Amino acid sequence: AFKDHRYITVDGKPLFLIFDPYHFKDVRHFMELWRKMAKENGLKGIFFVAMCASTTTVKRNEDGTIRRVMPNLESSADIYNSFLELGFDGINPMGKGRAEMMYQGKYWRIARKAMQKAFPFMPALKYDYPKVMKHFFSPEDNWDNVFPTLFPQWDRTPRAGKHEGIYVNATPENFEHHIEDALQLIKNKPEQRKILFLRSWNEWGEGNYVEPDTKYGHGFLDAIRNKIKK
């Protein structure tokens, strides 16, 4: 598959995304081995991308264990650099946690989640999509080796119950504004690095999709087409 001419490449190397690298044991060795095998099979290497949150409440210790930390909402540089130093070539950030904490206040969000565990009858949190998405991208998302995420809508209550939030006012029109913000981030990047990831195409169990539905029809797909065509 890596040799297929349709495969997405960066710097001539096939792009390979790793989900949740925090919990990938020996990920550095894994990448070194795959790069070696790629070159042995006629490829230039592999362009590994870490899919990670743009802010985090956990950090990996040198022995591989995880510890809790207070999130830094002003900058994602430390997080991104930690993965680049680990051997990743690029970053695919997820700004959902950052956006929600900046919308609500990080202490309120942490307290609210604790209250939900203690009092399960509490209703699910509701987030106003256009207001939350103002905080979705961090300043470092315009780095050349960072590939931002498009986030159309969210409702994970079918899977997580009331412990997850629901995004209201997540309309195709508001999604278009979000796409425009993302396009502004990548417009001055090198051509091969003008990449956006979509989360998600059809994650129905998390209310996170752009596929046609009975409410908006092809609205979210039209929003993507309208912006990409420009």
PLM-predicted stretches and their roles:
Residues A1-F2, I8-D11, L84-E85, P139-N142, ...:
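Extracellular/periplasmic catalytic domains that process cell-envelope and extracellular macromolecules
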Residues A1-F24, K194-E203:
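Active-site groove signature of glycoside hydrolases
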Residues P14, G45-F47, V146, R193-L196:
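Residue-level recognition of the N-termini of beta-strands and the immediately preceding loop/turn
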Residues D26-V27, M31-P172:
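Aromatic-lined glycan-binding groove of carbohydrate-active enzymes
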Residues H29-K36, H177, D181-Q184, G219-N226:
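Alpha-helical scaffolding segments of alpha/beta enzyme cores, especially the outer helices
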Residues W143-V146, I195, A223-I224, I228:
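Conserved structural scaffold segments of CAZyme catalytic domains across common CAZy folds
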Residues T171-P212:
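Substrate-binding cleft of secreted/luminal carbohydrate-active enzymes
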Residues R199, G207-K230:
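Aromatic-rich peripheral "rim/lid" segments of glycoside hydrolase catalytic domains that contact
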